[in-house]
Amino acid sequence: VMVCVWMLAILWKGRPEPWRVWSLALWMILLLDPLSVLRAGFWLSFAAVALILLLTAGRSGRRSRRQRLLTVQFGLVFGLTPLLWVWFQQISLSAPIANLLAIPWVGFLVVPLLLAGILCLPFSSLLSDWLLGLSADLLSILWWLLEQLAVLPVNLWQSPAVSGIWMLLFALGVVGALLPRALSLMPVSLLLMSAVFRLEPERPDSGELWFSLLDVGQGLAVVVETRHHVLVYDAGPAFRSGFNTGEAVIAPFLVQRGYRHVDRMVISHSDNDHIGGAEAVFERLDVLAIQSGEPGAIGWARATRCRSGHQWIWDGVHFEYLAPFDREEGNNSSCVLRVEAADGRVLLLPGDIERRIEQQLVRQRYPQLAADILVAPHHGSRTSSIAEFVEAVGPDYVLFPVGYRNRFGFPRPEVVERYRAIGASMLDSAESGAIQLRVEAGKPLQVLAYRQRSKRYWKAER
């Protein structure tokens, strides 16, 4: 759209004023597609063009072309930092080098060869094939070089999300630093930017825990946070299409919360809807310990088996495995994790255990089953949540990790009725999105459901 507006302006007025063209293109996009403001591409595209105009306006002076090119490239990376922070919580530190390499490579080598190959096509297919093949080889070399940059250990800078007002102050600082020197507000800009970097992510106090059931469709992914530690219980599904909930949901959530590593990942068992996203989490964050009910089946050498009775304490919060008792397979091998805050409130994560293990828990672990928060066993399947288990746990809140209109019909009506009979409040991720519960000393349980907190008409398409 911006190119079309620019060409029309040239035809109409000859030499259009750049900012007017930019403004007109912005107005046209918003007129044609108002919801484009919800997409990162809209903000990044218009911000990049605005930065180029700002960085090149009245700055030619005595600078050489090389100096102006460097100014624009590094200015773009610096200027787009606020938007990259807001949308992705990460910034590529190698982007200026990649752009300095790719732009002349493509502009002076690849594109001319492509055009020459196309022009030669009617006259000599042999020469055309050679030119087009050469351009393809040059693109392959460029791609290889960019891949080497991408795997550098210092390639990405990741940062937690910050509130809107702080990000606005940071953006103002960036703009002030990029203004022409005569108008520069560098001291104020540096002060604004440094203030944002000193912010610490919000964390629970010692003895408290924050529990997040992430919306990964028909699967399970839970994050448990204490004062100085974080545990991930299951990692959602991955699909043949390439979509991976670890990459799309879990890792971004952890990065947004300011974590650079996971203290412990628990993979309840080896089904895809519980393990599929784990590899993607490993790629983004360091995972210090891995435990599973089926360590051999998940295929990671450093994974150890979760066992009934194993317990530990993080920041005044007590963790204990209630099952598996023996070497089980499939759903019944699931790690059943009990988490107790300092004030005695309990979270129970049973994975996909079924009737037999529930009966065994009722017989052998009855006193420890009582919980305030329960993630329903096996997503609310009729093979789980037997009456004796439901009564033994007696939860105030039951959460069903299910996909919208899933093919299994979870949660099953008879299971829902059992929990309703004991007066439990029920939430499911299909209707509520991500669900967070905060167990904080001296406060009632705080329940935060994403869909209720973020009501927008364009998200109601169901």
Task: Please give the residue ranges for each predicted region.
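Alpha-helical transmembrane segments of multi-pass integral membrane proteins
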Residues: 50-154, 396-401
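Core dinuclear metal-dependent hydrolase active-site scaffold
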Residues: 8-11, 27-38, 147-264, 296-373, ...
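Short internal beta-strands
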Residues: 266, 288-294, 397-402
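Active-site HxH/HxHxD metal-binding segment of metal-dependent hydrolases
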Residues: 270-307
